[in-house]
């Protein structure tokens, strides 16, 4: 997963705030869907410096490193087909829709970006932060 944005304004968390990731729950751990990083409940992770990069001045700013997550996640259910769901990731209003069909093994995990962490957020509600903590809370898709 690569964070991208026209603007890359670094922010520092004034307080803890919640974010969400898609992945797998394995025992007491959460494994992210894209990078397969394993998070332990309520354990601090290594702080990762965030470096926005633009190949050319007119390119989107991109950040590969850091902890990638979403500001919001909403799930649309269809009673006539319980194996089909629309997952609204990022910003429910301006974010994007990801369709997960028959992915009953996936979970939405709740995480905290701790106070003092650096982070960037784009217009799609995607967040990349220098630190993240898994709360141990999840919802099965």
PLM region descriptions:
Residues 1-65, 73-141:
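Conserved NAD+-utilizing ADP-ribose enzyme module
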């Amino acid at each position: 997963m690569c964070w991208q944005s026209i603007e890359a304004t670094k922010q520092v968390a004034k307080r803890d705030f919640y974010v969400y990731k898609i992945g797998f729950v394995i025992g007491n751990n959460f494994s992210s869907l894209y990078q397969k990083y394993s998070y332990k409940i309520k354990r601090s992770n290594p702080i990762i410096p965030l470096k926005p990069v633009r190949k050319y001045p007119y390119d989107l700013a991109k950040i590969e490193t850091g902890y990638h997550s979403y500001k919001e996640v909403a799930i649309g259910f269809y009673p006539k087909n319980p194996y089909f769901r629309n997952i609204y990731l990022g910003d429910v209003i301006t974010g994007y829709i990801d369709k997960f069909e028959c992915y009953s093994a996936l979970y939405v995990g709740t995480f905290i970006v701790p106070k003092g962490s650096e982070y960037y957020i784009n217009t799609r509600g995607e967040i990349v932060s220098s630190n993240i903590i898994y709360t141990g809370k999840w919802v099965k898709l």
